[in-house]
Amino acid sequence: MMRLDPVLPSQIREIRFYTQNLFGCSLSVSALTEGKRWLARLAIAKEFHILPRMSMDPETVESVDGILCEMPLSSRRFENFARNILGCGVEDWKKKYSGTLDKNHWEVSIKCESGEEISSCGDGAYPSEFLLMIQAWDDLILLNSIMQCMAMEPADFKRYGVAV
């Protein structure tokens, strides 16, 4: 069902995407404002750093291994990104998508300046526009490349000269 009062990109203060997948990794990406600065932030936590199979929320991911990278965004770039996310129909997604237990869990949330929060999550089930949302994130921070890195084992990182 379409909202009668659609959210405008200029009303958004934070957009966050979180996933925990079968590779034993958790990923949190967000585009947000801190004061007058717009940022894109990425945090990845490999679950072998903490208790086995412990479920993590996005804030825990940022605190376990810390923020992997943070880059400034212009307000125009953030608004274009927000417009792309809203174009995926996130406002109209169900609160929860239940499906097969494929060990993939995802959450997306949008926080508005009014305090309103729009959120959706799923376990093995996805709205039809999900890949459009992933493409919007990929355009912002190369998300597909990051998710491929998440599948790498510690030995793979060492092979590429990354300390683990």
What are these regions (language model features)?
Residues 26-62:
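Short, flexible N-terminal segments of the mature chain
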Residues 1-23, 61-69, 76, 80-164:
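Short, well-ordered, aromatic-rich surface patches in folded extracellular/luminal domains
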